Amino acid sequence: LGLGALAAELRADVDYVKAVGTLAKIYEQDGTELLHGDFYPGSWLRHLASDSFWVIDPEFCFMGPAEFDVGILVAHLVLGGKSLIRALEVFDLYSSLPQFEPELALRFAGVEIMRRVIGVAQLPLESDINKKSELIACSKKLILSSNHVF
């Protein structure tokens, strides 16, 4: 089972395709938060001498839902081998936004995982097909589950 077969399975999953389409519509709507738009580790810099942190490459910025950038962050924690439990720590940072929806952020994370494993923006992940299959299963769970339990 290769990446092509994994992609074909997702394309054949009507519920998955519909859910991703719904997320695309949310992504395309005007939102209230200024987003980075590509908030993954390749856009983060840490200057060790001053212990400062910078986010670079603002050319993708747009107004949208905060859950989008947070979902990208959570996806890259998962792609980096971290547990989804780390998402709870991230969500705590957004608890002051009353409209923030952790479930939506997790769904966006699911799309980003899929995009980085089998999409046009694949990461050079050092993992075998079994690990990539697990990541795709995680993507499906995040996108299709209505109530995520950690």
How would you label these PLM feature ranges?
Residues G42-L73:
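Catalytic activation segment of kinase domains across protein kinase-like and atypical kinase folds
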Residues D51-D57, L88-E101, H148:
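Short amphipathic alpha-helical segments and their helix-coil junctions
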Residues F39:
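Hydrophobic HxD+1 residue recognition
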Residues A8-A12, Q122-F150:
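Regulatory N- and C-terminal appendages and interdomain linkers associated
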Residues A66-L97, G110-S127:
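Active-site activation/catalytic loop segments of kinase-like enzymes and analogous catalytic loops
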Residues L1-H36:
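An alpha-helical support segment within catalytic cores of ATP-dependent transferases
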Residues E28-G31, F60-F62, L77:
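Charged, long alpha-helical assembly modules
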Residues Q99-A109:
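All-alpha amphipathic helical-bundle segments outside canonical DNA-binding/catalytic cores
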